[in-house]
Amino acid sequence: LIVPDYVEAKTIADLEKYAKDFDGKITGIDAGAGVMRRTEEAIKEYDLKSIKLMPSSGPAMTTALTRAEKSQKPIVVTGWIPHWMFAQWKLRFLEDPKNVFGEAEHVDTVANPGLEAKAPEAAAFLKKISWSAEEVGAVMLLIRDGVKPDEAAKQWIAKNPDRVAEWLK
C-alpha cells in the first residue's frame, strides 16, 4: 500500500489509527487484480475494522492521488513499482511487518533460447541491460505526459550515455 510522504501512517497497522484522515478508504484499482486480493488479505490480517477497499481502475486511482496531492490530503492507494506515479510525487510503501504483500519482486529479461546462437550481439546486450525502477518510472511518466515511447527512450538515452555505452560494450 502506498501513501504520499506527508501521510502520518508508517505501517499498514497504522491505518486503523489514522482512518479518519483518509475517510477510512483505500483507493484501489480493478477488482480481481492481485494487489486488490492482497489488500483484502491485509485488511483482515491487520484487523483494520475501519478500513474499506474501494475498487476503481488504474486511471481512477491515479486521478484520486493527483487530487489528494494537489490539496495535500491524506490518501492510501494500491500500487506497485515500476509506475510513473513514483516519478511524479514523493510516495512510499507502508511497512508490512506481517509480509502480506510478500517480498520485493523483480523484472527479468526473457528471450528465445536460440537467440544466443542466432544473434549473439543482441543476446549479450540483453544480458547487460539493467535499469532501476525509478528510471523506468521516469520514462513511464514521460509517456503518460504525452511523449511518444520512442522519443521518451531517446531522451533517457541522451541523459544516460555512459550507461548505454556500458551495455553496448
Which positions does each model-derived feature cover?
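Extracytoplasmic/secreted envelope proteins and their assembly/folding machinery
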Residues: 12, 16, 36, 40, ...
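A conserved helix-loop-strand patch within extracytoplasmic ligand-binding domains
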Residues: 1-32
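C-terminal functional modules
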Residues: 133-169
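Metal- and O2-centered redox machinery and metal/ROS homeostasis
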Residues: 8, 15-18, 41-52, 73, ...
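Soluble non-cytosolic domains of exported or imported proteins
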Residues: 6-9, 29-34, 56-59, 116-117, ...
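Short amphipathic alpha-helical coupling segments at ligand-binding clamshell hinges
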Residues: 14, 117-129
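A bilobed periplasmic-binding-protein/Venus flytrap-type ligand-binding module shared by bacterial periplasmic
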Residues: 1-9, 105-118
